Amino acid sequence: MTTNYAHYIDHTLLAMDATEAQIIKLCEEAKQHHFYAVCVNSGYVPVVAQQLAGSSVKVCSVIGFPLGAGLTAAKAFEAQAAINAGAQEIDMVINVGWLKSGKIADVKADIKAVRDNCAATPLKVILETCLLSDEQIVQVCEMCRELDVAFVKTSTGFSTGGAKEEHVKLMRATVGPVMGVKASGAVRDRATAETMIQAGATRIGTSSGVAIVSGQQAAASGY
């Protein structure tokens, strides 16, 4: 069976120097190829919502990005503000420093505060797997499952590494068959996307969506 890669893709542009013209082009590509969503920083949500109005492509905003180290109240506020501006999905970054400090209850409360402000809006929780042990990956996946989060997500694409097959498999095994798993960071071609899907990913975050659906080789850099 042929994989419909477009339906997996969150077409993504998160660079700090991304221009409005580049964001508009991103939206045009997403509509042309019928990608699942466009994922941007929250400041560009109003532009994306306007560009995607009337299309099937969803508006996704990152929150607390890329460090995840801000105040919980700020993350919760940003999520609510992004939703008010038109975001239909939210991707938040956990506080990795708290996790590595053993402040597990605080990490969980941080996620819960954002999830509560999301209400019915699907929340994806970014683990930054390249910085975590397998035990820590399982720990966060379990708390996300307990909090009824929609997705767990591998990476920001801004740290020391992106999605790895073994991490996606571990995340899928931990959360079970129903919850979403998003592979992001360094997924730049069809072969890598297929590897992640076979490992259990139900969404792919990438700036190389056009290359993936067309079977071409993307640039070596990018999300």
Curated annotation (Swiss-Prot):
GO MF entries: deoxyribose-phosphate aldolase activity
Top EC class of this enzyme: lyase
Subcellular location: Cytoplasm
Predominant location category: cytoplasm
GO CC, any one term: cytoplasm
One of the GO biological process terms: 2-deoxyribose 1-phosphate catabolic process
Gene3D superfamilies named among the record's database cross-references: Aldolase class I (3.20.20.70)
Residues of the active site: 91 (proton donor/acceptor), 153 (schiff-base intermediate with acetaldehyde), 182 (proton donor/acceptor)
Enzyme Commission number(s): 4.1.2.4
InterPro entries linked to this entry: Aldolase_TIM, DeoC, DeoC/FbaB/LacD_aldolase, DeoC_typeI
Associated pathway: Carbohydrate degradation; 2-deoxy-D-ribose 1-phosphate degradation; D-glyceraldehyde 3-phosphate and acetaldehyde from 2-deoxy-alpha-D-ribose 1-phosphate: step 2/2
Reactions performed catalytically: 2-deoxy-D-ribose 5-phosphate = D-glyceraldehyde 3-phosphate + acetaldehyde
UniProt xrefs under Pfam families: DeoC (PF01791)
Keywords, in A-Z order: Cytoplasm, Lyase, Schiff base
Domain of life from the UniProt record: Bacteria
Entry similarity comment: Belongs to the DeoC/FbaB aldolase family. DeoC type 1 subfamily.
Descriptive protein name: Deoxyribose-phosphate aldolase
Species name: Yersinia pestis bv. Antiqua (strain Angola)
Gene this protein is translated from: deoC
